[in-house]
Amino acid sequence: MRRNIKLIVFVSIIWMFVMVYYFQSSTEKVENRALRLREVATAMQQYQDDSSSAAAASTARQWAPAGGGAGPGAAAGAAGSGADDPGGNVILIGSVKDFERNAVHGLKLNGIVALEETSQGLSGGTGGPGGRLPVAPSGRGTEVEYFNEAGYIRAGALRNGEDPYIRNRFNQEASDALPSNRDIPDTRNPMCRTKKYREDLPETSVIITFHNEARSTLLRTIVSVLNRSPEHLIREIVLVDDYSDHPEDGLELAKIDKVRVIRNDKREGLVRSRVKGADAAVSSVLTFLDSHVECNEMWLEPLLERVREDPTRVVCPVIDVISMDNFQYIGASADLRGGFDWNLIFKWEYLSPSERAMRHNDPTTAIRTPMIAGGLFVIDKAYFNKLGKYDMKMDVWGGENLEISFRVWQCGGSLEIIPCSRVGHVFRKRHPYTFPGGSGNVFARNTRRAAEVWMDDYKQHYYNAVPLAKNIPFGNIDDRLALKEKLHCKPFKWYLENVYPDLQAPDPQEVGQFRQDSTECLDTMGHLIDGTVGIFPCHNTGGNQEWAFTKRGEIKHDDLCLTLVTFARGSQVVLKACDDSENQRWIMREGGLVRHYKINVCLDSRDQSQQGVSAQHCNSALGTQRWSFGKYA
């Protein structure tokens, strides 16, 4: 008897532990609401509440179960209850008016019919939220269905033994192992967490373009938008699939509430894909995001508030870092702004000490930035259209952030980074996709278009920094110049003086070639740092024979300077990184001598076949020391 009592007590204790554990696990489980499909009863009720009784009756007939012989169900075939749709639901992404006209032209995805919304339906003012019929009723009551996250990611998983970096240039294995709604640290300043935002914020259309993106990363981007944004502020997510190898990467995501998918029928590149998404968007505010980001807590409200207060503001979040190796989320400094050097390559730079001191009392204030990174920003749609959208003749990727930054500032707008908005971004060391013609040529072409339209005479500083860019055709820019005139945009000099005074114009310098005997020219011979230079027949096209003679006496080829190796007669002259040292200073003398400014040695080509151009005792009688510097013949 005593043993039975002990056994009963023991079993009871075990049962209590089991119940406590089960209760905790069930209550602590957080719903991933972003992966909801469309809720049956709620959606239908919303539609009926907003319709007249006659329209509701008509609609009820049209909502007949698929396979019932009439309405959209018939158009969809046996989608309602057949083997293709185990759930028994037909989910429609389309306009009410299209639906009521029985104009059901859709794409069946595992029992789901996805329809593009039409502008007529969206503006009609009927139907559920945003003019949509989110879900067709079935016999399943109010049960909510969820997107099959595991199945979606598994279909794009790595093959056995496949390098996890090969497809996306980041560790896809690490990304696939993470849930779409993983927790990330709140990296905002504590003062941001107490800020209140106005209640009349506009809703936004989020535009995400992608090409062969890892499924787990793309899904995590979408989930972070939906889970960490107030539901009423996200009108839609417009996914623009830039002709990915597998159309299902995007089409499967059309099952998720608020997600629309547009697929290009050929590769268009970032710029044209974004414009296509913007044109299709229905909200008055556009939010552009990359396809490998994670939005942080309350990321959207501070951005929308700044645009609501002034539609000419273009605003960006602080961009946190997501490790390409293990996907760790790392907070970035909020004391950064975007800038560039004269090579027109974007860079992050710290605010000046005085600016940081001014922000000490309120680190939540907006930061004016001369340049945006380009991947993540919010802009008023009407203002985006007025400004000329993007330069549609730019290809693939690169330079578009430069162009839109110049255009916004010079044409009456402003760029801001909002410290209380945080979005993480996977930064990679290389692009995962190919560029027709090569990435360098595409970037140079796009950058030249921006420089030729917006930089006026200051574009020469770009060509001095990147001489090879002048060999890349940039196409016709007449339409962009006409836009600049139409908008009465300010000159680049104004931009330097009022927006980016820290970018100092380089010292004046002449660019040309050093000739000898009228037929031979000083040439790098294809060498780079620590390489010798020689002479080669002049070809008058720049390249290896293009030199800049600066006011300080440097003889430069790109970022390399002619450098005297030793202060002695017979010393080699080589290319080294310009460092403003005495070894790199030269003077042009009468008679064509190129003399070192400190000792009496001059550039001499007598031994160029053995050791390249060297520094010999100056003698104007020697033809090997006579040079002329000037423009190309």
Swiss-Prot record:
Expressed in developing oocytes and egg chambers. No expression observed during embryonic stages 9-11. During embryonic stages 12-13, specific expression is observed in the developing tracheal branches and brain. During embryonic stages 14-17, expression is restricted to the dorsal longitudinal trachea. In third instar larvae imaginal wing disk, expressed in clusters of cells in the presumptive pleura and notum. Its cofactor is Mn(2+). GO terms for biological process: protein O-linked glycosylation; protein O-linked glycosylation via threonine. Residues 201-306 are annotated as: Catalytic subdomain A. It is found in: Golgi apparatus membrane. Pfam families: Glycos_transf_2, Ricin_B_lectin. Gene3D superfamilies: 2.80.10.50, Spore Coat Polysaccharide Biosynthesis Protein SpsA, Chain A. Disulfide bonds join 192-420, 411-489, 521-538, 561-578, 602-618. Pathway: Protein modification; protein glycosylation. Residues 1-4 are cytoplasmic. Keywords: Disulfide bond, Glycosyltransferase, Golgi apparatus, Lectin, Manganese, Membrane, Metal-binding, Signal-anchor, Transferase, Transmembrane, Transmembrane helix. One of its GO terms (molecular function) is metal ion binding. There are two conserved domains in the glycosyltransferase region: the N-terminal domain (domain A, also called GT1 motif), which is probably involved in manganese coordination and substrate binding and the C-terminal domain (domain B, also called Gal/GalNAc-T motif), which is probably involved in catalytic reaction and UDP-Gal binding. Catalyzes the initial reaction in O-linked oligosaccharide biosynthesis, the transfer of an N-acetyl-D-galactosamine residue to a serine or threonine residue on the protein receptor. It can both act as a peptide transferase that transfers GalNAc onto unmodified peptide substrates, and as a glycopeptide transferase that requires the prior addition of a GalNAc on a peptide before adding additional GalNAc moieties. Prefers the monoglycosylated Muc5AC-3 as substrate. O-glycosylation modification of proteins by this enzyme might be important for cytokinesis. This is Polypeptide N-acetylgalactosaminyltransferase 2.
